[in-house]
């Protein structure tokens, strides 16, 4: 009987079991069974507050992923990639005739003639596609080192280009697929 533990001699230190559902725990009675000093308790409270009850504030200057030379400034646009031919020019170029706009090989985005286009399609879509080139054509594709790591989605509805993927750009850099 020499090794019997008497409950009135050894009190249970409930503070070591304290967790988020016991934040408002107060020891009952006039005896506090804690061996934690006030400095340690303040440190533990700060850790608990930072882990479970802290609302993260968004950084006004988000850091971009390293390794991309165009991502040095905090506010980057997709035009900073600077691949020639990947983005349409910003300034308006006057053309001699409307038929001159349809010069590419993708018949979905640019048919052979404007009259055939207006006969087959809604004229509203002409203004949406006239200044944006078909990204499926080889000369419109980005360089392999630039297109690396982007979320690749089909960019053209024609059957010839359904298997090819193009990068969809995000403001803060490439959108990685959820499985990477």
Swiss-Prot record:
One Pfam family here: TSC21
Effect of deleting the gene: Deficeint mice are fertile and have no detectable defects in the testis/body weight ratio, epididymal sperm count, and testicular and epididymal histology.
GO CC term (a single one): axonemal A tubule inner sheath
Signal peptide positions (record): none
Keyword Cytoplasm included in the entry's annotation: yes
InterPro entries xref list: SPMIP9
Quaternary structure (record): Microtubule inner protein component of sperm flagellar doublet microtubules.
Function as written in the Swiss-Prot or TrEMBL entry: Microtubule inner protein (MIP) part of the dynein-decorated doublet microtubules (DMTs) in flagella axoneme.
UniProt-recorded name of the protein: Protein SPMIP9
Provenance organism: Mus musculus (Mouse)
């Amino acid at each position: 009987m020499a090794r019997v533990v008497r409950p009135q001699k050894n009190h249970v230190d409930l503070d070591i079991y304290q967790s988020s559902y016991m934040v408002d725990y107060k020891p009952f009675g006039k005896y506090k069974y804690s061996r934690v000093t006030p400095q340690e308790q303040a440190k533990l409270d700060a850790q608990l507050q930072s882990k479970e009850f802290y609302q993260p504030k968004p950084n006004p200057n988000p850091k971009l992923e390293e390794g991309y030379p165009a991502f040095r400034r905090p506010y980057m646009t997709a035009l900073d990639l600077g691949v020639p031919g990947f983005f349409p020019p910003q300034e308006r170029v006057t053309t001699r005739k409307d038929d001159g706009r349809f010069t590419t090989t993708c018949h979905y985005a640019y048919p052979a003639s404007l009259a055939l286009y207006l006969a087959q399609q809604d004229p509203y879509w002409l203004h949406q596609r006239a200044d944006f080139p078909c990204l499926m054509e080889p000369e419109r594709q980005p360089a392999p080192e630039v297109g690396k790591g982007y979320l690749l989605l089909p960019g053209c509805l024609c059957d010839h280009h359904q298997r090819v993927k193009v990068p969809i750009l995000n403001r803060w850099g490439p959108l990685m697929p959820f499985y990477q």
